[in-house]
């Protein structure tokens, strides 16, 4: 639920436009999938996805240049006008235009990416916050959104690839932060272990993640599993990088063997 404050009073504002970016993209209007008339255009929805990602007003020139980058400027702007017409039912209340710049109304739109950023921007975020942020993800950023609009939209596809890389890095950083935070919160160790497992499934060569998982398992009283994780680390480093574990990892292994962790 969103709120606004006027004169010290708190007023509830109904969230009616939900936009999902962290996985297969979705737009729901008052709880129902958004269907545009007379044409349920993927490009029109891509405009909303772009604005939801940007989080700031964007010019018509920018939007036309992205989604019709292979077309002459005049034609691109003409196509953009047609797509914006399909979105006319959302204008003012959800889609705002001021001085030729378009943006989404934060008072009436709920965007999972904005919530992810809100939960992770605090450097002292608790494990529960970071876990909530990670549960917003259900796949690749804007998974499959380019289907049907790649033709003539090379710059949009390029932008999409950059965004995917950046937000995937943010997701993995959050997983690592969650695991680190869990070392200081014994009742959240299970969340940290799960985060390490997910990270290593994607990047088995990350030795620091293996160490973190070893420490978490040891703190959880799972000494045998912690030592087994060292073996998995050794195998992964040899397979992926052709190197043995570092002195730091070996020292942690010795500490666990001695019951010092």
What is each PLM-predicted segment?
Residues 167, 230-234:
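Amphipathic alpha-helical coiled-coil/heptad-repeat segments
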Residues 1-194, 198-207, 221, 225, ...:
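Intrinsically disordered, low-complexity protein-interaction/activation regions
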Residues 83, 212, 229:
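Residues within the DNA-recognition helix of helix-turn-helix
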